[in-house]
Amino acid sequence: MSAIQAAWPSGTECIAKYNFHGTAEQDLPFCKGDVLTIVAVTKDPNWYKAKNKVGREGIIPANYVQKREGVKAGTKLSLMPWFHGKITREQAERLLCPPETGLFLVRESTNYPGDYTLCVSCDGKVEHYRIMYHASKLSIDEEVYFENLMQLVEHYTSDADGLCTRLIKPKVMEGTVAAQDEFFRSGWALNMKDLKLLQTIGKGEFGDVMLGDYRGNKVAVKCIKNDATAQAFLAEASVMTQLRHSNLVQLLGVIVEEKSGLYIVTEYMAKGSLVDYLRSRGRSVLGGDCLLKFSLDVCEAMEYLEGNNFVHRDLAARNVLVSEDNVAKVSDFGLTKEASSTQDTGKLPVKWTAPEALREKKFSTKSDVWSFGILLWEIYSFGRVPYPRIPLKDVVPRVEKGYKMDAPDGCPPAVYEVMKNCWHLDAATRPSFLQLREQLERIKTHELHL
């Protein structure tokens, strides 16, 4: 290990670059691709004490492993499979053949160094749109500005907004899927040879969720075909590389296969979504202590996101999963972004989303707190859909006039007070997740003494 490299602290995750059989009794053997966790630095900086997935500890050589890093979404061109770099106008037109309306790529501008060009196939022709770079922002029409190319492409994928067509299908750069390099560099790329796909456990709009086996461990695998939605899932995986908490579903790694698509591999949550878990068991099986534990599990995950300046934006019982040992973990980070960013509100679940987020696209930890209040209501109603007997179109007008749902049957008054505190129309008066956790822990302590 180089003398200038700082020692890795305890808890650092590493991925093995080579096989290590060990030469002494205290060594920890491992195979290329294994994930190891640093336990302590040794006196010799070239060696660490580490543990493997099953908790066995031993000494490992530092130069055989690579530290896992968080992938920063939105800053790396390598996460954009439609970006082709320095190619000419003529090369772009050849790549967009045979013609297919909505097929597109982005290249560096040959006429305007520093700018980009969006090339789009439409009605048998290829249109070239200059993307101007000015004052650290990007724009095609000098009306709408974007922080980066990903945001720009995301916008025109959902709306043509003056272009000849909406962007439908990216022309993936030949020979490589750029994201692969980035996940490999940061230690999150897994090998397809080590993954067995067993059975479909869920179907979504963008692909399937499958039960898999990765090196003898059960895993869940999101399988996404390479299309215009792949970028959103790469962004989700990028967010997950930056987050680590016992109540967040853990990313194990990413596989990018040019022909077969994108695979996001996470820990397997045997008991499925919290909403289904609650509905299938109900009041006769689940006691108040169990409901309070699930509430605290989710609250602790959200307190962690709050502390790391992430906003989930889609918190609901359907996006919380339950493990074999009944631990609730927050999942589905598809909309999760750093707290400063905004978002199109077209696809947001109205009944779970804070009024200011629907009205003004103002997302913050406090809008997540509103959603947490709805999730608490779901937990204590054993998975009922919120705002029962109110037509969807009437929910927002009634909420904005101050309407709050009644307490679910049998819900402790103290828990209902927590829900109502989450539903203040003034976001600033809602509690933080730290305060919510403290309130729920006080309720738990009080119940233990009853």
Swiss-Prot record:
The keyword Ubl conjugation belongs to this UniProt entry's keyword annotation: no
SUPFAM superfamilies reported in the protein's UniProt record: Protein kinase-like (PK-like), SH2 domain, SH3-domain
Modified residues (N-acetylserine): S2
Substrates-to-products reaction catalysed: L-tyrosyl-[protein] + ATP = O-phospho-L-tyrosyl-[protein] + ADP + H(+)
The protein's required cofactors: Mg(2+); Mn(2+)
EC number(s) reported in the record: 2.7.10.2
Superkingdom per UniProt: Eukaryota
Record keyword Transferase present: yes
Active site: D314
Signal sequence residues: none
Binding site for ATP: I201, G202, K203, G204, E205, F206, G207, D208, V209, K222
Region described as Interaction with PTPN22: spans on this chain: 9-70
Residues covered by the Protein kinase domain: 195-449
GO molecular function annotations of the record: ATP binding; identical protein binding; metal ion binding; non-membrane spanning protein tyrosine kinase activity; protein kinase A catalytic subunit binding
Protein modification: Phosphorylated at Ser-364 by PKA, leading to increased activity. Autophosphorylated.
Modified residues (Phosphoserine): S364
Principal subcellular localisation of the protein: cytoplasm
Keywords per UniProt: Acetylation, Adaptive immunity, ATP-binding, Cell membrane, Cytoplasm, Immunity, Kinase, Magnesium, Manganese, Membrane, Metal-binding, Nucleotide-binding, Phosphoprotein, SH2 domain, SH3 domain, Transferase, Tyrosine-protein kinase
Subcellular location: Cytoplasm; Cell membrane
Modified-residue entries (Phosphotyrosine), positions: Y304, Y416
SH3 domain span: 9-70
Physiological role: Non-receptor tyrosine-protein kinase that plays an important role in the regulation of cell growth, differentiation, migration and immune response. Phosphorylates tyrosine residues located in the C-terminal tails of Src-family kinases (SFKs) including LCK, SRC, HCK, FYN, LYN, CSK or YES1. Upon tail phosphorylation, Src-family members engage in intramolecular interactions between the phosphotyrosine tail and the SH2 domain that result in an inactive conformation.
Family, per entry: Belongs to the protein kinase superfamily. Tyr protein kinase family. CSK subfamily.
Subunit details: Homodimer (via SH3-domain). Interacts with PTPN22. Interacts with phosphorylated SIT1, PAG1, LIME1 and TGFB1I1; these interactions serve to recruit CSK to the membrane where it can phosphorylate and inhibit Src-family kinases. Interacts with SRCIN1. Interacts with RHOH. Interacts (via SH2 domain) with SCIMP; this interaction is dependent on phosphorylation of a specific tyrosine on SCIMP. Interacts (via SH2 domain) with PRAG1 (when phosphorylated); this interaction prevents translocation of CSK from the cytoplasm to the membrane leading to increased activity of CSK. Interacts with LRRK1.
Annotated protein name in UniProt: Tyrosine-protein kinase CSK
Native source organism of the sequence: Bos taurus (Bovine)
Lineage start: Eukaryota, Metazoa, Chordata, Craniata, Vertebrata
